[in-house]
Amino acid sequence: MRVLNIEDDTFKHNDICKALSGCGIKDVEWSNNLADGWKQIKNSIDSNNPYDLIITDMYYPGEPGGREEQSGDILIDREIKNKITIPVILCSSVNLKYPEIYGCVYYSRERNWEADMQTLVNSLVAG
């Protein structure tokens, strides 16, 4: 399974990679801003090798070196408007619900968010 993680926090990205490795997933590409992440998504589709899953935070820069904004929302809207069918998991330290995407994970060190992530990913892999 090929995954793109759009996340500006290196430590959280590494945590997500560890959770995914518990599902046997090692192929995780990373972007830390919306502009580059969107290019990676479009390039994967244009090259006929789309990602199997996109994991996105809610708050990260829209552009390289930019300020943090609600870029996850923009990404989800773009996916819907462009009819992109790659499943999206929102992994945020804000407990959010988005019924139009594959799933949401509430990232918090006080809870077992890894199990929530692994349940969603394993369900996706199982089809």
Describe the function of each predicted region.
Residues 1-12, 16-20:
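Conserved acidic segment of CheY-like receiver
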Residues 9-13, 59-65, 95-97:
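Short acidic, S/G/P-rich loop/turn micro-motifs used as interaction or catalytic elements
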Residues 17-18, 30-53, 61-63:
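Acidic, metal-coordinating helix/loop segments flanking the phosphotransfer/catalytic sites
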Residues 51-82:
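Conserved phosphotransfer microenvironments
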Residues 52, 102-105:
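Conserved acidic residues
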Residues 90-92:
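Hydrophobic/aromatic residues positioned on beta-strands within the core alpha/beta folds
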Residues 97, 109-125:
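C-terminal output helix
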